[in-house]
Design a protein with these regions (language model features):
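Membrane-water interface at loop-to-transmembrane-helix junctions
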Residues: 600-619, 645-653
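Conserved cytosolic headpiece of P-type ATPases
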Residues: 1, 5-598, 602-606, 619, ...
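A C-terminal functional module that forms or caps the active site or interfaces directly
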Residues: 670
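Transmembrane alpha-helix/helix-exit interface in multi-pass inner-membrane proteins
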Residues: 622-630
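Generic alpha-helical transmembrane segments
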Residues: 576, 622, 652-667
Length: 744
């Protein structure tokens, strides 16, 4: 087998002869090739541990070597089969679904109580007012009138626009998120991303770049350079030959081909700096690929009229044979400060760097002493620069980030420190073996301080998700391999990587197209924006409900059984529900949302602050509607006595107009928690269009509604009075917000 996919239907094959190097990235996401050979010791291996040395798994790619293998497992007993069974199960209820179910019960209770109160109010007003029906039909008509209004209130209490809002939010946010390399294919993923309290993230490709790259070049006197462009020209030429020609990969037609991951990283280091990596390739006399026994590779070339051999390999072996080194200006100097150089190498190893030494000598052999050190290169799958900032911002948002990797503990800890995950003495890093020694109860105690899990197995991810969810945490999981799919499915929100397998993408809720942690942060921000928009809509809609119930309940006590007709209430319900969904579905994603703590899974979607806003606004609208209908001063101002007889139809028309306009203006209050109701208004043009449409519709309803809506046209004076009363809801709420903010 050479550079081929390992099998079609098998789970694992045991090597019986030979040695191969295998890329297992499709299963564990790690870029480092795994060596597989015969189990000569007869030692028993955990067959589900992808790091074992004698089993080759389906879906992996053989990069080099030859081997005979014995098929061990097929069918639904395979890893693929087991994963497929686990992925099929999907019984999750999202945090938002839990909150909305709780809210639905509360709204239903409020609606039923309000409906009963209205029926009681109508009958009480009739009986106490002395207008007791004389005939059976009068009783029937009174009952029908009261029950009709009550049923209408129940209908109005249900926020029918909420499903439309979530659909609009998903489509609108999805378009914006696609531009940020985030693809949403399950709506519950976007809902839940905003409530995350714990995120398990892969290391390779997510926190790191996902490929090896040269981080630093150091000379024998430890002069350090971070790129080829920084190297002085004499040293630059030597490094170019030392790693460009002594390399199994090559650069052709804009692509780096061949070689292992280390050789490709060295070639990329040259290409990215605009260096011609193929320079003087025609001068190559002999090339010896990496020898595992000698721990180095060599290339012999004709250089400046003489034969020179360049050596690249394990730095400790190469430096031990060096007597001199090239300084930054290309001058040959005695290598006397070996301890200084070795200290530097130890420091880099502590940062999980893979070190390579490059040396040269005259002649066509490199077996002797007296080498000249060209440089030492530090290579690593480097931390993404943007990931460090993104991790910090996610942590500031109250979300715990845990890096889960198949890499060794030392490497994982070094990366975690650089990424900002390990900052305190209380932070914990565990290996898979250490994790397995903990009981579930012990793991739950450690979990709040857990930051790194190394040598992780697929079962570790699923267990971490389960224990975190038992602590009532909202859990996110990233993954790219087939073995990640159960954990992606079990997590509250699964982030599949764009470069990952189709199985992982199918199991996840959101696909991160560029595999970047920064994009995960953006997904969380958009999720929080969606949740905020739902809350804004609920403030708006619940205010309508409270105002409608209170107005219809109190009006009969003042002598008006039907201050808002059934048709008017249905018009309000239809217009406010549907158009409000459009208005709040386009709210901008504000970074201030990332400064807030996550919302608990079982927390109510309606907070006390929201209820205070709903109650104050609802009471104001109710009070103004009752004042318009029953206060003589306002009646005269509206022109209801212009004929000498009280025009109740005109007053009810003014009530209807004021009710709808006040609700419309309350949208400005609902869309922000701050005292300025007009902030960021330019970033949601749909909101302005909807409010404008509602005001125009209200004018048309009252002017042309006639007998259908039980209204009559208002004078311009009456319209101005109604408009002023309705607009006052904005300063009223500004005062409320100022008072409540001082109490914090």
């Amino acid at each position: 087998l050479l550079a081929s996919s390992a099998a079609s239907d098998v789970y694992k094959r045991q090597i019986v002869e030979g040695l191969v190097k295998v890329d297992q990235a499709t299963l564990n996401g790690e870029t480092k090739e795994a060596t597989k050979t015969v189990n000569e010791s007869g030692e028993a291996y955990n067959t589900k541990d992808l790091l074992n040395r004698c089993y080759v798994y389906r879906g992996t790619v053989v990069c080099s070597g030859e081997a005979y293998m014995e098929v061990k497992v097929v069918g639904d007993k395979t890893l693929f089969g087991e994963l497929a069974l686990e992925v099929q199960e999907d019984t999750r209820e999202t945090p938002l679904q839990v909150k909305l179910a709780k809210l639905a019960k509360q709204i239903s209770t409020f609606g039923y109580i309000g409906a009963i109160a209205i029926v009681v109010g109508v009958f009480a007003r009739t009986l106490l007012g002395g207008n007791i029906p004389n005939t059976f039909m009068e009783w029937v008509n009174l009952s029908i009138e009261a029950i009709t209004v009550a049923v209408t209130i129940i209908v109005c209490a249900v926020p029918e626009g909420l499903p439309m809002l979530t659909s609009i939010l998903l489509s609108y946010q999805s378009m914006r998120m696609a531009k940020d390399n985030v693809l949403v294919h399950k709506i519950n993923g976007l809902e839940t991303a905003g409530s995350l309290s714990l995120l398990f993230s892969d290391k390779t490709g997510t926190i790191t770049e996902g490929k090896l790259s040269v981080v630093e070049v150091a000379t024998g006197n430890v002069r350090k350079f971070s790129s080829m462009k920084e190297l002085p020209l004499p040293l630059k030429d030597e490094v170019t030959i030392g790693i460009g020609l002594n390399n199994s990969s090559s650069y052709s037609n804009g692509s780096i081909i061949g070689g292992n991951s280390t050789d490709r990283a060295l070639m990329s280091f040259l290409v990215d700096a605009g260096v011609d990596a193929n320079v003087a390739r025609e001068d190559v006399r002999n090339f010896n690929a990496f020898d595992s026994a000698k721990k180095y590779s060599t290339v012999t070339i004709n250089h400046n009229g003489k034969v020179v051999t360049y050596i690249k390999g394990a730095p400790e072996r190469i430096i031990a044979r060096c007597q001199t080194y090239l300084d930054e200006n290309g001058a040959v100097k005695p290598l006397t400060e070996r301890n200084f150089l070795m200290t530097y190498m130890d420091e880099q190893a502590g940062r999980s760097m893979r070190l390579l030494g490059v040396a040269k000598c005259d002649g066509d052999t490199a077996d002797g002493e007296g080498l000249t050190l060209v440089c030492v290169l530090a290579i690593r799958d480097n931390v993404r620069k943007e990931a460090v900032d993104a991790i910090r911002e996610v942590q500031e948002a109250g979300i715990q980030v845990v890096m889960v990797t198949g890499d060794r503990k030392e490497t994982a800890v070094a990366i975690a420190k650089e990424a900002g995950l390990l900052k305190h003495n209380t932070d914990v890093a565990l290996t898979s073996a250490e994790l397995a020694e903990l009981s579930d109860d012990e793991l739950k105690k450690v979990l709040p301080n857990l930051r790194v899990v190394s040598r992780a197995l697929p079962t570790d991810k699923s267990r971490l998700v389960r224990c975190a969810q038992e602590l009532n945490l909202v859990v996110g999981m990233t993954g790219d391999g087939v073995n990640d799919s159960p954990a992606l499915k079990k997590a509250d929100v699964g982030f599949a990587m764009g470069s990952g397998t189709e199985v992982a993408k199918e199991a996840g809720d959101i696909t991160i197209l560029d595999d970047n942690f920064l994009s995960i942060e953006k997904a969380i921000l958009y999720g929080r924006t969606m949740f905020k928009s739902i809350r804004k809509f609920l403030i708006f809609q619940l205010t309508v409900n409270v105002a409608a119930v209170l107005t219809c309940f109190l009006a009969p006590l003042f002598g008006e059984n039907e201050i808002l007709t059934v048709i008017q209430l249905l018009v309000v319900n239809l217009a406010m529900d549907t158009l409000a969904a459009i208005a709040f579905g386009s709210e901008p994603a504000l970074m201030e949302y990332m400064k807030e703590k996550p919302i608990a899974r079982d927390a109510s979607i309606v907070t006390g602050k929201m209820m205070s806003q709903v109650v104050v606004s609802g009471l104001y609208i109710t009070a103004m509607c009752l004042c318009i209908r029953f206060v003589p001063a306002l009646q005269h101002l509206l022109g209801a006595w212009s004929t000498g007889v009280l025009d109740t139809t005109l007053l009810n028309s003014a009530v209807f107009a004021t009710f709808m306009m006040a609700i419309s203006f309350n949208g400005f209050n609902a869309r922000t928690e701050h005292t300025n109701p007009f902030e960021h208004l330019g970033r949601n043009k749909n909101f302005l269009l909807v409010i404008g449409a509602l005001l125009v519709l209200q004018f048309l309803f009252v002017t042309f509604g006639g007998a259908v809506l039980s209204v009559e046209p208002l004078s311009w004076t009456a319209w101005l009075v109604c408009l002023l009363i309705a607009f006052l809801i904005i300063p009223i709420d500004i005062i409320r917000k100022a008072i409540t903010s001082k109490k914090k």
